[in-house]
Amino acid sequence: LKSAYLMADAIFLIDNQRYVKKNAPIMNNMAAINARVVEPFYNLLCAGEETSQKYIGSKILDAGDIIQTLAGWTIIGQGKSPTPPRGFFSKEKHDFRDRMTETSKGTHAMDEALGELSLTCEPKDAGRALYLLTAPPKEMNMEIIKELGDNLKAMAPNALIRSGDYPRQKSSLDVTVILSELNSVRKITNYFTKALDLISMIKAKQGLEYSSRKLEETFSDIPVLL
């Protein structure tokens, strides 16, 4: 982890255990885990490369936005809200209640994305973030996009937030969220702490002194694989 952190611009952290199904065969688990790991990236990577005019959003989230967002420890999540099919007899104009329902679907998808992050973290620790709304064109409006931005800002008040929309989805309203430049990730801190404890034990057995210091001060003591 330290070696990758020092060399890479950003590292996506994914906890496989979050996707493990109890009593499922190992091979089935691995296939399901891999599928769930890559799923949130699909809309994110397609939105900025879309060539069909009818699928280009009002605010495009392209590779430049993604690159500007990614830094250091990074976590991704995705949430979905089903949308009812709109047939020939469906209303063309939405009233206030329809718009409220659509906004609540967006909020639900955002909450699910933050609840299904690839690794448990505190959103308030993020320095950068982005969200992408993917939905049928008729399910999108500026109220939803603004509501999503307000919700994410409330959860990640210290983050510089980028956003975009992708009017391509057919049967659901999807929200993809990235939290990046995380200044504290408990699981990573635990790994580094255990590594330093092991180094301390080894030095003690060798008769070497190893003073007690803060984690930030002892980070350099962890060897790298470079």
Language-model regions, residue ranges each:
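Tubulin/FtsZ superfamily GTPase core signature
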Residues: 1-226
